[in-house]
């Protein structure tokens, strides 16, 4: 996978050098680069923002520098895909492998500043990249979306600042890439970099070869629509608090049932909306019994909460 990040604060993305993501880049599993839209400006102050039309507080990111930066990374991704296809063709000689630095800062465009630019095109050897625009106005980012993005070949993240990026940048980008505005949640950050750090980590850890033990992904929170069960390690007794006896029994079937029960009860307590999103027909009798103890019941194929009122996914009863 190739990931490009557009940001006027490239140093903000340096944590991506660390841990498993940094190792994945070093090992060639992932290509990660950061591009600064300021490198595509034409004035000596490298201006990337201006006052909003219609008045109002704050500044708005100008569309031209961001579009030029986007064009550059789309072209780079298309060239890389074409080169990869050429290397795998039978008549082509095998190219030597080269190490990829953890976070690359892309150079500015090779054309003269202010020169006319033509509309960029996606390389025919790969699908159109996905442009993720972090925004409080976007769709809420979830584990399901992380899995969807992990299946893509090329992701581009545009880290807006201030009041956001001129909407014409997004409208123009839709003619060449697949645009996906995403939000971490119902709150506002100073810029998109923090959101991108979270999204990139959530996505890349799902790529084969990034996580050492793939089985760990199958037991995490949100996998299967439930939160993860509690975990424990040595010592068996710590400050007079003992590990649940069932985990010391060695009885794998009972341990699996205990963990499932913990997932259900924890999710019902902390995220009742996730229980409401479950298909009751996919739960066994033991599952339904645990949920009944937490106040969730199935009547006529629909969820009901204690208190006699119906509960639907769209209007969860957040106790």
List PLM regions with ranges.
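S-adenosyl-L-methionine/SAH cofactor-binding core of RNA-modifying enzymes
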Residues: 62-161, 208
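Short, hydrophobic/aliphatic alpha-helical segments
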Residues: 36-47, 143-149, 174-175
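Surface-exposed, charge/polar-rich loops and edge strands
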Residues: 182, 205-209, 214-246, 257, ...
């Amino acid at each position: 996978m190739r990931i490009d990040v557009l940001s006027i604060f490239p140093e903000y993305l340096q944590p991506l050098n660390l841990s498993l993501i940094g190792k994945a880049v070093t090992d060639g599993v992932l290509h990660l680069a950061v591009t600064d839209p300021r490198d595509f400006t034409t004035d000596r102050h490298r201006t990337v923002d201006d006052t909003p039309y219609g008045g109002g507080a704050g500044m708005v990111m100008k569309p031209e520098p961001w579009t030029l930066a986007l064009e550059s990374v789309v072209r780079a991704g298309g060239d890389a895909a074409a080169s990869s296809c050429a290397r795998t063709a039978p008549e082509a000689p095998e190219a030597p492998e080269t190490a990829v630095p953890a976070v690359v800062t892309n150079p500015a465009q090779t054309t003269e500043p202010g020169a006319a630019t033509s509309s960029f095109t996606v390389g025919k050897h790969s699908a159109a990249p996905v442009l993720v625009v972090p925004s409080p106005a976007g769709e809420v980012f979830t584990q399901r979306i992380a899995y969807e993005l992990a299946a893509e070949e090329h992701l581009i993240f545009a880290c807006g600042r201030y009041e956001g990026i001129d909407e014409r940048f997004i409208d123009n980008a839709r003619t060449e890439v697949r645009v996906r505005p995403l939000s971490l949640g119902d709150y506002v950050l100073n810029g998109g970099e923090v959101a991108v750090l979270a999204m990139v980590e959530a996505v890349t850890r799902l790529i084969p070869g990034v996580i050492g033990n793939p089985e760990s992904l199958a037991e995490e929170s949100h996998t299967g629509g439930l939160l993860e069960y509690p975990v424990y390690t040595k010592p068996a007794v710590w400050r007079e608090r003992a590990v649940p006896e069932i985990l010391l029994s060695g009885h794998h079937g009972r341990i699996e049932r205990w963990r499932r029960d913990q997932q259900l009860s924890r999710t019902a307590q902390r995220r009742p909306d996730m229980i409401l999103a479950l298909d009751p027909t996919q739960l066994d009798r033991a599952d339904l019994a645990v949920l009944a103890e937490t106040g969730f019941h199935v009547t006529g194929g629909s969820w009901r909460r204690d208190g006699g009122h119906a509960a639907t996914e769209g209007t969860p009863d957040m106790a």
